[in-house]
Amino acid sequence: MHLLQESTARSICMHGRVEWVSGSKAFGVNDSGDRLDFDWDDGPTPMQVTLQMIGICSMADVVLGLKERVFDKVWVELSAERATTTPRVFTAVHLEYHVRGDVPLNLVERIVKMSHDKYCSVSHMFNENITITHSSVLHPLSEA
């Protein structure tokens, strides 16, 4: 049984399932059947995964935005602050984008800004009380 109705002209409906296996092990499956395994004791915690998801969502925008440029590596260093009381939500997130290639820094910065202002759905899921900042670092191809 789906809790939400199927897609309409105003929204896209997404389905998934998470299932506990044993101990701290669980898995998630999306509506396409793709599976992710989790272990909150011996792997990333749900909050760590959430932080990584904002990085991967926005990094995908950067890679797609640079598709006509010469580059061979993109990564994002992530840091976050959390509230000290329950619920221990994120209060601040910083993403430092690294691009190795022959790419103008102002282009990377513009793509990153557009990602967070418009395209990255995960970034927009965060409460407006969370401060999200970002910076960009270029690395020459000779560092390969």
What is the predicted function of each stretch?
Residues 2-53, 60-144:
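Extended beta-strand/beta-hairpin segments
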